[in-house]
UniProtKB/Swiss-Prot annotation:
It is found in: Virion; Host membrane. The keyword Transmembrane applies. It comes from Xanthomonas phage Xf (Bacteriophage Xf). Residues 1-19 are periplasmic. This is Capsid protein G8P. Keywords: Acetylation, Capsid protein, Helical capsid protein, Host membrane, Membrane, Transmembrane, Transmembrane helix, Virion. Homomultimerizes. There are several thousands of this protein in the phage capsid. It is a single-pass membrane protein. The modification N-acetylserine is found at S1. The chain crosses the membrane at residues 20-37.
Length: 44
């Protein structure tokens, strides 16, 4: 057990990190886009 279990957990986290990072990045991009859009609309 010991070492093998640790490796499985790490590989599972690394496997999940990609999609989570992609979703997080998309959400962040949308939020920034909305802020910029509102700011530009108010400036015009």
């Amino acid at each position: 057990s010991g070492v093998g279990d640790g490796v499985d957990v790490v590989s599972a986290i690394e496997g999940a990190a990609g999609p989570i990072a992609a979703i997080g990045g998309a959400v962040l991009t949308v939020m920034v886009g909305i802020k910029v859009y509102k700011w530009v609309r108010r400036a015009m």
